[in-house]
């Protein structure tokens, strides 16, 4: 009797221990409850149709997008909290994303930066998961993948791809995590207060990563690049050809902290653009061959990292998905 109980106890312990080390299922291959669906067998065949169907409601809404490439140009202006989910086998990383929204037009052709955007978000409280957004125009002109022009926007394990002016973080508070941002010239730009965490920031040509446009001392906006990996696109030699940023407007404010800066970063670090600019550029506890600050230009000193509360506001936990 005692032997049987002992065997059962050992079996129970063994099963419990095995279960503890099994990887948790992080996939999303079907629509979360209550979401409308987009895809060949979904409620709608295009994302644009699904957005239009939301109408003037102010209720929380969600859209699940099945795997595929969607050649669309979208404007999101919904009055309620909207969540967009892309199909994936691993929600924690952009590397398994299967949904791409793409469009190809330059800003000169479209008439403005905003009009060139593949996705233009104008409404607050939008959360985007596991979706790739691209502008396929390439080099030669500004061509925006995403305009994020609203407050309390969250992007989780997404990809943004372009060349010049990829990600227009234009206004409001914005959060990007586990994502990939690719471009060459000013490819993260605007005057949002934006936090980038655990992101791959990938240069596909010589140029400048950030072009922040803060203009007044009363403007509380920051770009905080935290625990990110700066790198060159595969097969591209950019040694010394990339700058951390240049000021689109005179009081640009950017910090790189706890990030990996490789040898693609020019020793000067930062560059000029706006006439009379006095930008606030900071670096704190970075590593890598490009992290030496001894030859930096335009660099200000800072004694501690910037916090999420400073960049996103004291209430950020109310709208940021803390499971990432």
Curated annotation (Swiss-Prot):
The keyword Secreted applies. Glycans are attached at residue 285. GO terms for biological process: cell wall modification; pectin catabolic process. Its main location: secreted. Pathway: Glycan metabolism; pectin degradation; 2-dehydro-3-deoxy-D-gluconate from pectin: step 1/5. This is Probable pectinesterase A. It comes from Aspergillus oryzae (strain ATCC 42149 / RIB 40) (Yellow koji mold). Residues 1-19 form the signal peptide. One of its GO terms (molecular function) is pectinesterase activity.
């Amino acid at each position: 009797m005692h032997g049987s109980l002992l065997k059962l106890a050992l079996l129970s312990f063994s099963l419990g221990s095995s279960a503890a080390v099994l990887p948790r299922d992080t996939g999303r291959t079907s629509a979360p409850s209550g979401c409308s669906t987009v895809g060949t067998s979904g409620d709608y065949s295009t994302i644009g149709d699904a957005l239009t169907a939301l109408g003037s409601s102010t209720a929380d809404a969600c859209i699940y997008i099945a795997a595929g490439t969607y050649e669309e140009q979208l404007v999101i202006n919904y009055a309620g909290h909207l969540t967009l989910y892309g199909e994936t086998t691993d929600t924690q990383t952009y590397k398994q994303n299967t949904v791409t929204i793409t469009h190809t037009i330059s800003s000169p052709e479209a008439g403005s930066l905003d009009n060139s955007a593949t996705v233009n978000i104008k409404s607050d409280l939008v959360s985007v998961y596991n979706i790739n957004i691209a502008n396929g125009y390439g080099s030669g002109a500004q061509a925006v993948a995403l305009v994020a022009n609203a407050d309390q926007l969250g992007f989780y394990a997404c990809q943004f791809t372009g060349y010049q002016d990829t990600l227009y973080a234009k206004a409001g508070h914005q959060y990007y995590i586990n994502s990939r941002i690719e471009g060459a010239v000013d490819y993260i730009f605007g005057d949002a207060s934006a936090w980038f965490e655990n992101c791959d920031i990938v240069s596909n040509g010589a140029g400048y990563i950030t072009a922040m446009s803060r203009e007044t001392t009363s403007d509380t906006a920051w770009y905080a690049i935290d625990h990110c990996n700066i790198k060159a696109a595969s097969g591209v030699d950019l040694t010394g050809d990339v700058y951390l940023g240049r000021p689109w407007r005179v009081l640009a404010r950017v910090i790189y902290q706890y990030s990996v800066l490789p040898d693609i970063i020019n020793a000067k670090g930062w560059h000029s653009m706006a006439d009379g600019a006095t930008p606030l550029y900071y670096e704190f506890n970075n590593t890598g061959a490009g992290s030496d600050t001894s030859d930096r230009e335009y660099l200000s000193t800072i004694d501690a990292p910037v916090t999420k509360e400073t960049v996103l506001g004291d209430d950020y936990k109310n709208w940021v998905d803390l499971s990432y």
